[in-house]
Amino acid sequence: MKTFIALLAFVTSICQANVERFSITSKIIDETTTVRVSLPDTYTHSSSFSYPLLIVLDGATQFPHVAASTQFLSTYAILPEMVVVGVSTHKRLQYFTPTEHEEFVGRSGQASAFKGYLHKELLPSLKSKYRIAPYYVISGHSMGGLFTSYLALQNENEFNAHIAISPSLWWDEKTLMDTYLSTEQLTQPKRWFLSMANEPGEMNDSYIAMLDALKKKPVKNLHWFSQRFNGETHDSTPLVGNAQALKSLFHNWNAVPEVDVMSLQQLQVFYQHISGEYGYNFPLSAHQYNVYGLKAAYEGKTAWGVEILEQGVKHFAQSEILWDSLATAYNLDNKPVKALSASKQALQLAKTNDSIYLHEITSQNNQLMSKVESLNGVESL
Protein backbone atom coordinates (compact mmCIF):
# COMPACT_ATOMS: atom_id res chain seq x y z
CA MET A 1 0.00 0.00 0.00
CA LYS A 2 1.34 3.38 -0.99
CA THR A 3 2.19 5.85 1.77
CA PHE A 4 0.16 9.06 1.84
CA ILE A 5 3.09 11.37 2.47
CA ALA A 6 1.16 14.52 1.69
CA LEU A 7 -1.72 13.49 3.94
CA LEU A 8 0.56 12.64 6.83
CA ALA A 9 2.15 16.07 6.60
CA PHE A 10 -1.17 17.58 7.55
CA VAL A 11 -1.65 15.77 10.85
CA THR A 12 1.43 16.85 12.76
CA SER A 13 -0.37 19.51 14.77
CA ILE A 14 -4.07 18.62 14.55
CA CYS A 15 -4.66 18.61 18.28
CA GLN A 16 -4.04 22.36 18.59
CA ALA A 17 -7.77 22.96 18.96
CA ASN A 18 -9.41 26.37 18.76
CA VAL A 19 -10.96 26.56 22.25
CA GLU A 20 -13.51 29.18 23.30
CA ARG A 21 -15.21 29.65 26.67
CA PHE A 22 -18.42 31.24 27.96
CA SER A 23 -20.86 30.89 30.88
CA ILE A 24 -24.58 30.15 31.15
CA THR A 25 -26.57 31.26 34.18
CA SER A 26 -29.20 28.55 34.23
CA LYS A 27 -32.75 29.12 35.41
CA ILE A 28 -33.41 25.38 35.40
CA ILE A 29 -30.61 23.98 37.56
CA ASP A 30 -29.93 27.17 39.55
CA GLU A 31 -26.26 27.16 38.67
CA THR A 32 -23.83 29.07 36.47
CA THR A 33 -22.08 26.61 34.19
CA THR A 34 -18.80 27.15 32.38
CA VAL A 35 -18.88 25.94 28.79
CA ARG A 36 -15.72 25.20 26.80
CA VAL A 37 -15.91 24.77 23.05
CA SER A 38 -13.36 23.18 20.71
CA LEU A 39 -14.02 24.01 17.07
CA PRO A 40 -12.77 21.74 14.26
CA ASP A 41 -9.60 22.99 12.59
CA THR A 42 -11.58 23.33 9.35
CA TYR A 43 -14.30 25.51 10.91
CA THR A 44 -13.11 28.66 9.10
CA HIS A 45 -12.71 26.86 5.77
CA SER A 46 -16.41 27.39 5.04
CA SER A 47 -18.98 29.92 6.16
CA SER A 48 -21.93 27.55 5.75
CA PHE A 49 -20.91 23.99 6.70
CA SER A 50 -22.47 22.74 9.95
CA TYR A 51 -20.82 20.23 12.29
CA PRO A 52 -22.23 17.51 14.56
CA LEU A 53 -22.01 18.24 18.27
CA LEU A 54 -20.27 16.24 21.01
CA ILE A 55 -21.05 17.28 24.59
CA VAL A 56 -18.66 16.03 27.27
CA LEU A 57 -19.87 15.94 30.89
CA ASP A 58 -17.42 16.70 33.70
CA GLY A 59 -15.79 18.98 31.18
CA ALA A 60 -13.19 20.34 33.59
CA THR A 61 -11.36 16.99 33.50
CA GLN A 62 -12.68 15.13 30.46
CA PHE A 63 -12.98 17.82 27.79
CA PRO A 64 -9.30 18.25 26.78
CA HIS A 65 -8.55 14.62 25.92
CA VAL A 66 -11.92 13.99 24.22
CA ALA A 67 -11.47 17.10 22.07
CA ALA A 68 -7.96 15.97 21.07
CA SER A 69 -9.11 12.42 20.24
CA THR A 70 -12.00 13.74 18.16
CA GLN A 71 -9.71 16.10 16.27
CA PHE A 72 -7.19 13.35 15.55
CA LEU A 73 -9.62 10.61 14.50
CA SER A 74 -11.74 12.89 12.32
CA THR A 75 -8.66 13.99 10.39
CA TYR A 76 -8.47 10.45 9.00
CA ALA A 77 -12.25 10.30 8.34
CA ILE A 78 -12.62 7.64 11.06
CA LEU A 79 -15.46 9.70 12.52
CA PRO A 80 -17.13 13.03 11.70
CA GLU A 81 -15.51 16.34 12.44
CA MET A 82 -17.41 17.69 15.45
CA VAL A 83 -17.79 20.73 17.64
CA VAL A 84 -16.75 19.40 21.06
CA VAL A 85 -18.23 21.05 24.15
CA GLY A 86 -17.26 20.48 27.78
CA VAL A 87 -19.71 21.29 30.57
CA SER A 88 -19.74 20.54 34.30
CA THR A 89 -22.11 20.75 37.24
CA HIS A 90 -21.16 21.21 40.89
CA LYS A 91 -23.98 18.86 41.92
CA ARG A 92 -23.27 15.62 40.07
CA LEU A 93 -25.23 13.40 42.46
CA GLN A 94 -28.26 15.65 42.24
CA TYR A 95 -28.37 16.17 38.48
CA PHE A 96 -26.93 12.93 37.09
CA THR A 97 -29.26 10.52 38.95
CA PRO A 98 -32.67 9.67 37.44
CA THR A 99 -34.38 8.75 40.74
CA GLU A 100 -34.26 10.07 44.28
CA HIS A 101 -32.56 7.64 46.67
CA GLU A 102 -33.81 7.40 50.24
CA GLU A 103 -30.28 7.98 51.54
CA PHE A 104 -29.91 11.15 49.48
CA VAL A 105 -33.29 12.83 49.79
CA GLY A 106 -33.16 16.35 48.37
CA ARG A 107 -29.71 15.68 46.89
CA SER A 108 -30.53 13.23 44.08
CA GLY A 109 -33.03 12.32 41.40
CA GLN A 110 -33.03 15.47 39.28
CA ALA A 111 -31.65 14.10 36.00
CA SER A 112 -34.78 15.40 34.29
CA ALA A 113 -33.80 18.94 35.34
CA PHE A 114 -30.30 18.58 33.88
CA LYS A 115 -31.86 17.15 30.74
CA GLY A 116 -33.97 20.32 30.60
CA TYR A 117 -30.85 22.45 30.99
CA LEU A 118 -29.21 20.67 28.07
CA HIS A 119 -32.22 20.87 25.77
CA LYS A 120 -33.63 24.28 26.68
CA GLU A 121 -30.54 26.29 27.57
CA LEU A 122 -27.25 24.76 26.43
CA LEU A 123 -28.27 23.49 22.99
CA PRO A 124 -30.08 26.72 21.97
CA SER A 125 -27.10 28.77 23.16
CA LEU A 126 -24.65 26.65 21.17
CA LYS A 127 -26.81 26.72 18.05
CA SER A 128 -27.03 30.51 18.24
CA LYS A 129 -23.24 30.88 18.46
CA TYR A 130 -21.94 28.10 16.18
CA ARG A 131 -22.86 26.19 13.03
CA ILE A 132 -24.27 23.03 14.62
CA ALA A 133 -25.73 20.18 12.56
CA PRO A 134 -28.75 18.31 14.01
CA TYR A 135 -26.71 15.32 15.19
CA TYR A 136 -25.77 15.31 18.87
CA VAL A 137 -23.48 12.99 20.84
CA ILE A 138 -23.07 13.08 24.63
CA SER A 139 -20.38 11.44 26.78
CA GLY A 140 -20.32 10.79 30.51
CA HIS A 141 -18.19 8.87 33.02
CA SER A 142 -19.30 7.20 36.26
CA MET A 143 -22.36 9.17 37.45
CA GLY A 144 -22.13 11.05 34.16
CA GLY A 145 -22.33 7.68 32.42
CA LEU A 146 -25.48 6.89 34.39
CA PHE A 147 -26.96 10.14 33.09
CA THR A 148 -26.04 9.50 29.45
CA SER A 149 -27.49 5.97 29.78
CA TYR A 150 -30.68 7.48 31.18
CA LEU A 151 -30.83 9.79 28.15
CA ALA A 152 -30.28 6.89 25.73
CA LEU A 153 -33.58 5.35 26.85
CA GLN A 154 -35.60 8.57 26.66
CA ASN A 155 -37.80 9.16 23.62
CA GLU A 156 -38.07 12.85 24.48
CA ASN A 157 -34.37 13.34 23.87
CA GLU A 158 -32.62 15.24 21.09
CA PHE A 159 -29.35 13.32 21.40
CA ASN A 160 -28.54 10.70 18.77
CA ALA A 161 -25.58 8.89 20.36
CA HIS A 162 -24.63 8.27 23.99
CA ILE A 163 -21.34 7.26 25.60
CA ALA A 164 -21.32 5.73 29.09
CA ILE A 165 -17.82 5.06 30.46
CA SER A 166 -17.92 2.93 33.63
CA PRO A 167 -21.52 4.05 34.28
CA SER A 168 -22.97 3.85 37.80
CA LEU A 169 -25.77 1.50 36.72
CA TRP A 170 -26.04 0.20 40.28
CA TRP A 171 -27.89 3.35 41.29
CA ASP A 172 -31.13 2.79 43.23
CA GLU A 173 -31.27 -1.00 42.86
CA LYS A 174 -30.38 -0.88 39.14
CA THR A 175 -33.41 1.30 38.42
CA LEU A 176 -32.20 2.05 34.89
CA MET A 177 -32.39 -1.64 33.97
CA ASP A 178 -36.07 -1.58 34.93
CA THR A 179 -36.47 1.37 32.57
CA TYR A 180 -34.82 -0.59 29.79
CA LEU A 181 -36.93 -3.71 30.36
CA SER A 182 -40.11 -1.63 30.12
CA THR A 183 -39.00 0.01 26.84
CA GLU A 184 -40.25 -1.60 23.64
CA GLN A 185 -38.96 0.84 21.04
CA LEU A 186 -37.42 4.25 20.50
CA THR A 187 -39.04 6.66 18.09
CA GLN A 188 -35.72 7.58 16.46
CA PRO A 189 -32.45 5.65 15.89
CA LYS A 190 -30.20 5.93 18.95
CA ARG A 191 -26.66 4.67 19.57
CA TRP A 192 -25.40 3.70 23.03
CA PHE A 193 -21.86 2.70 24.00
CA LEU A 194 -21.22 1.17 27.43
CA SER A 195 -17.87 0.15 28.88
CA MET A 196 -16.38 -1.07 32.13
CA ALA A 197 -12.85 -0.97 33.50
CA ASN A 198 -11.32 -3.50 35.90
CA GLU A 199 -13.79 -2.71 38.68
CA PRO A 200 -15.22 -4.95 41.41
CA GLY A 201 -18.53 -5.20 43.20
CA GLU A 202 -21.71 -3.40 42.26
CA MET A 203 -20.13 -1.45 39.37
CA ASN A 204 -19.25 -4.66 37.56
CA ASP A 205 -22.37 -6.57 38.61
CA SER A 206 -24.75 -3.89 37.36
CA TYR A 207 -22.83 -3.60 34.08
CA ILE A 208 -23.11 -7.36 33.48
CA ALA A 209 -26.81 -7.28 34.36
CA MET A 210 -27.46 -4.50 31.83
CA LEU A 211 -25.54 -6.33 29.09
CA ASP A 212 -27.57 -9.48 29.78
CA ALA A 213 -30.78 -7.47 29.46
CA LEU A 214 -29.59 -5.87 26.21
CA LYS A 215 -28.78 -9.28 24.74
CA LYS A 216 -32.04 -10.92 25.79
CA LYS A 217 -34.47 -8.13 24.90
CA PRO A 218 -33.74 -5.98 21.86
CA VAL A 219 -35.31 -2.53 21.65
CA LYS A 220 -36.26 -1.26 18.20
CA ASN A 221 -34.06 1.60 16.93
CA LEU A 222 -31.47 1.12 19.69
CA HIS A 223 -27.98 0.24 18.44
CA TRP A 224 -25.75 -0.60 21.38
CA PHE A 225 -22.04 -1.35 21.73
CA SER A 226 -19.95 -2.48 24.69
CA GLN A 227 -16.32 -3.06 25.59
CA ARG A 228 -14.20 -4.14 28.54
CA PHE A 229 -11.02 -2.31 29.52
CA ASN A 230 -9.45 -4.77 31.93
CA GLY A 231 -6.15 -2.91 31.98
CA GLU A 232 -7.78 0.32 33.17
CA THR A 233 -9.04 1.61 36.51
CA HIS A 234 -12.20 3.61 37.14
CA ASP A 235 -10.20 6.85 36.94
CA SER A 236 -8.00 5.99 33.95
CA THR A 237 -10.62 4.47 31.68
CA PRO A 238 -12.13 7.71 30.24
CA LEU A 239 -8.97 8.37 28.20
CA VAL A 240 -8.98 5.12 26.22
CA GLY A 241 -12.71 4.59 26.69
CA ASN A 242 -13.89 7.73 24.94
CA ALA A 243 -11.60 7.20 21.96
CA GLN A 244 -12.81 3.62 21.58
CA ALA A 245 -16.42 4.68 22.12
CA LEU A 246 -16.23 7.15 19.25
CA LYS A 247 -14.66 4.52 17.00
CA SER A 248 -17.37 2.03 17.95
CA LEU A 249 -20.27 4.43 17.47
CA PHE A 250 -18.89 5.30 14.03
CA HIS A 251 -17.45 1.86 13.27
CA ASN A 252 -18.62 1.94 9.64
CA TRP A 253 -17.96 5.63 9.06
CA ASN A 254 -14.78 5.40 6.96
CA ALA A 255 -15.86 4.51 3.44
CA VAL A 256 -12.46 3.10 2.42
CA PRO A 257 -10.55 1.98 5.53
CA GLU A 258 -8.20 -0.30 3.58
CA VAL A 259 -6.59 -0.04 0.13
CA ASP A 260 -9.81 0.27 -1.88
CA VAL A 261 -10.88 3.67 -3.17
CA MET A 262 -14.19 5.16 -4.31
CA SER A 263 -15.34 7.74 -6.81
CA LEU A 264 -17.28 10.80 -5.64
CA GLN A 265 -20.56 9.21 -6.73
CA GLN A 266 -19.75 5.98 -4.88
CA LEU A 267 -18.93 7.95 -1.73
CA GLN A 268 -22.24 9.78 -1.90
CA VAL A 269 -24.12 6.49 -2.30
CA PHE A 270 -22.17 4.95 0.60
CA TYR A 271 -23.09 7.70 3.06
CA GLN A 272 -26.68 7.81 1.86
CA HIS A 273 -26.88 4.07 2.56
CA ILE A 274 -25.73 4.34 6.19
CA SER A 275 -27.82 7.43 6.93
CA GLY A 276 -30.79 5.30 8.01
CA GLU A 277 -28.75 3.61 10.74
CA TYR A 278 -27.56 6.97 12.09
CA GLY A 279 -30.82 8.82 11.62
CA TYR A 280 -29.04 11.61 9.78
CA ASN A 281 -27.55 12.11 6.31
CA PHE A 282 -24.07 13.55 6.88
CA PRO A 283 -22.62 15.73 4.09
CA LEU A 284 -18.95 15.19 3.30
CA SER A 285 -16.62 17.30 5.44
CA ALA A 286 -13.33 18.95 4.50
CA HIS A 287 -11.22 16.14 5.95
CA GLN A 288 -13.31 13.51 4.18
CA TYR A 289 -12.76 15.22 0.83
CA ASN A 290 -9.06 15.42 1.65
CA VAL A 291 -8.65 11.81 2.76
CA TYR A 292 -10.70 10.23 -0.02
CA GLY A 293 -9.37 12.51 -2.75
CA LEU A 294 -5.70 12.02 -1.90
CA LYS A 295 -6.15 8.30 -1.40
CA ALA A 296 -7.75 7.88 -4.82
CA ALA A 297 -5.00 9.94 -6.46
CA TYR A 298 -2.18 8.00 -4.78
CA GLU A 299 -3.80 4.65 -5.57
CA GLY A 300 -3.77 5.41 -9.29
CA LYS A 301 -7.32 6.73 -9.68
CA THR A 302 -6.14 10.27 -10.35
CA ALA A 303 -9.30 11.36 -12.16
CA TRP A 304 -11.37 10.26 -9.16
CA GLY A 305 -9.04 12.09 -6.82
CA VAL A 306 -9.24 15.28 -8.86
CA GLU A 307 -13.05 15.11 -8.99
CA ILE A 308 -13.35 14.60 -5.22
CA LEU A 309 -10.94 17.41 -4.38
CA GLU A 310 -12.48 19.81 -6.92
CA GLN A 311 -15.79 19.22 -5.17
CA GLY A 312 -14.03 19.77 -1.86
CA VAL A 313 -12.68 23.22 -2.72
CA LYS A 314 -16.10 24.15 -4.07
CA HIS A 315 -17.61 23.59 -0.61
CA PHE A 316 -14.54 24.65 1.42
CA ALA A 317 -13.08 27.44 -0.67
CA GLN A 318 -10.96 28.80 2.21
CA SER A 319 -9.18 25.48 2.87
CA GLU A 320 -5.47 25.69 2.15
CA ILE A 321 -5.36 21.95 2.90
CA LEU A 322 -7.79 21.03 0.12
CA TRP A 323 -6.24 23.41 -2.41
CA ASP A 324 -2.80 21.97 -1.72
CA SER A 325 -4.13 18.42 -2.01
CA LEU A 326 -5.86 19.34 -5.27
CA ALA A 327 -2.48 20.56 -6.53
CA THR A 328 -1.02 17.17 -5.63
CA ALA A 329 -3.82 15.35 -7.46
CA TYR A 330 -3.46 17.52 -10.57
CA ASN A 331 0.28 16.87 -10.56
CA LEU A 332 -0.25 13.11 -10.29
CA ASP A 333 -2.76 13.43 -13.15
CA ASN A 334 -0.04 15.03 -15.31
CA LYS A 335 -1.60 18.49 -15.23
CA PRO A 336 1.25 20.61 -13.83
CA VAL A 337 -0.18 23.98 -14.90
CA LYS A 338 -3.45 23.30 -13.08
CA ALA A 339 -1.44 21.95 -10.18
CA LEU A 340 0.54 25.19 -9.93
CA SER A 341 -2.63 27.27 -10.07
CA ALA A 342 -4.17 25.29 -7.20
CA SER A 343 -0.90 25.49 -5.28
CA LYS A 344 -0.81 29.28 -5.62
CA GLN A 345 -4.30 29.44 -4.14
CA ALA A 346 -3.20 27.18 -1.29
CA LEU A 347 -0.14 29.32 -0.62
CA GLN A 348 -2.13 32.55 -0.58
CA LEU A 349 -4.62 31.10 1.92
CA ALA A 350 -1.83 29.63 4.04
CA LYS A 351 -0.14 33.03 4.34
CA THR A 352 -3.39 34.86 5.02
CA ASN A 353 -4.45 32.36 7.68
CA ASP A 354 -0.97 31.94 9.18
CA SER A 355 -1.40 28.22 8.53
CA ILE A 356 0.61 25.64 10.42
CA TYR A 357 1.03 23.93 7.05
CA LEU A 358 2.75 26.90 5.38
CA HIS A 359 6.12 25.14 5.14
CA GLU A 360 4.70 22.07 3.36
CA ILE A 361 2.55 24.17 1.05
CA THR A 362 5.49 26.43 0.16
CA SER A 363 7.64 23.41 -0.58
CA GLN A 364 5.15 21.94 -3.04
CA ASN A 365 4.62 25.34 -4.64
CA ASN A 366 8.37 25.72 -5.26
CA GLN A 367 8.57 22.24 -6.77
CA LEU A 368 5.63 22.89 -9.08
CA MET A 369 7.02 26.27 -10.21
CA SER A 370 10.31 24.59 -11.11
CA LYS A 371 8.47 21.84 -12.96
CA VAL A 372 6.33 24.24 -15.00
CA GLU A 373 9.32 26.49 -15.78
CA SER A 374 11.27 23.44 -16.91
CA LEU A 375 8.43 22.32 -19.18
CA ASN A 376 8.09 25.82 -20.64
CA GLY A 377 11.82 25.86 -21.31
CA VAL A 378 11.66 22.55 -23.16
CA GLU A 379 8.72 23.77 -25.25
CA SER A 380 10.64 26.90 -26.28
CA LEU A 381 13.57 24.90 -27.67
Residue ranges of predicted features:
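Hydrophobic h-region of N-terminal signal peptides that target proteins for export
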Residues: I5-A17
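Non-catalytic cap/lid and distal C-terminal segments of serine-dependent acyl enzymes
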Residues: N18-D333, L340-G377
